[in-house]
Every structure is written in C-alpha cells, then in structure tokens.
C-alpha cells in the first residue's frame, strides 16, 4: 500500500530496565547473526575504605573499545588515578582483543586529559547549547 501512514501507539516506559533488557538482547542477537558482533562489557573500579572512588566502563565490540563514564572522585583528581584507570581499561581491552579505542567527552569534561593519553579528535559538534561534544579515538 502506498499513501498510508502507519501510526502505532508507542508506550513510554519508565523505569525501563526490563523492557530495555528484552529489546537490547534481540538487537544483540541481530548484530551477532549479521556480523559476528558480540559486546563484552566490564567496569574497572577503585575502592578506598569500601567506597568506590574511581571507575570507568568498557564496551568491546567489533575489535574496538568504547570507553564510557570514566570518573574519579574530586579529591583524587590530578593524582594520576585517572591515568591509571584509563590505562587499566585499555589494557583489559587489549587483553580481550581490541586494537582501537573510542570515546566522547564534552567541553566541560576531560578533553585535554584524553589528548594527553593519545586520543585524537575525529568529530566535534555543538551540543548542548553553549558547549560541544568531542568524539575521539586512538590505536591500542
């Protein structure tokens, strides 16, 4: 049929943990079947006195690491913990077969930090208003 618009009644769901797990698993199966894309996800954390004081997440797929959510507690910033954390995530990714790393950061976050650790900008766009997002990568 042509000329007809389908307007399904979508449902907004919050919280969405169960629903996301359902369709994300199906999407994962689709990608795995189509191109052998399997995602490995891990977190690196540092605890002091039982509390998490630094952490970051790695997603590995298609031979690449995506660094997500790198965070260091404010009193520990500038002490080398962030560099060690990023290095630990990259080392784990290499151990799992990744040969490239990618991430994004915002203008108020850690662009100079990532540049010091070999990341190169490959895209930049204005977002959100008054700021910008930088997409970066590097070879591992």
Regions inferred by a protein language model and the residue ranges of each:
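Short glycine/proline-centered loop/turn elements that form peptide/ligand docking sites
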Residues: 82, 86, 107-110, 127-133
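Conserved beta-hairpin
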Residues: 41-54
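Conserved GNAT acetyl-CoA-binding A-motif
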Residues: 93-107
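Conserved acetyl-CoA-binding loop-helix of GNAT-fold acetyltransferases
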Residues: 78-91, 116
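Conserved N-terminal entry element of GNAT/NAT acetyltransferase domains
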Residues: 1-15
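Conserved active-site tyrosine of GNAT-family acetyltransferases
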Residues: 23, 114, 119
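Conserved catalytic-core motifs of GNAT/GCN5-like acyltransferases
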Residues: 102-104, 120-137
């Amino acid at each position: 049929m042509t000329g007809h618009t389908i307007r399904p009644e979508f449902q907004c769901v919050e919280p969405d943990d169960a629903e996301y797990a359902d369709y994300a698993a199906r999407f994962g199966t689709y990608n795995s079947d189509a191109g052998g894309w399997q995602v490995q996800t891990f977190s690196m954390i540092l605890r002091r006195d039982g509390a998490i004081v630094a952490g970051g997440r790695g997603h590995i797929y298609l031979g690449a690491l995506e660094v997500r959510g790198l965070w260091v507690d404010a009193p520990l910033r500038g002490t080398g913990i962030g560099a060690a954390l990023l290095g630990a995530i990259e080392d784990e990714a290499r151990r799992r077969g990744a040969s490239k790393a990618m991430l994004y950061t915002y203008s108020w976050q850690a662009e100079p930090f990532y540049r010091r650790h070999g990341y190169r900008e490959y895209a930049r766009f204005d977002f959100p208003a008054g700021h910008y997002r930088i997409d970066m990568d590097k070879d591992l």
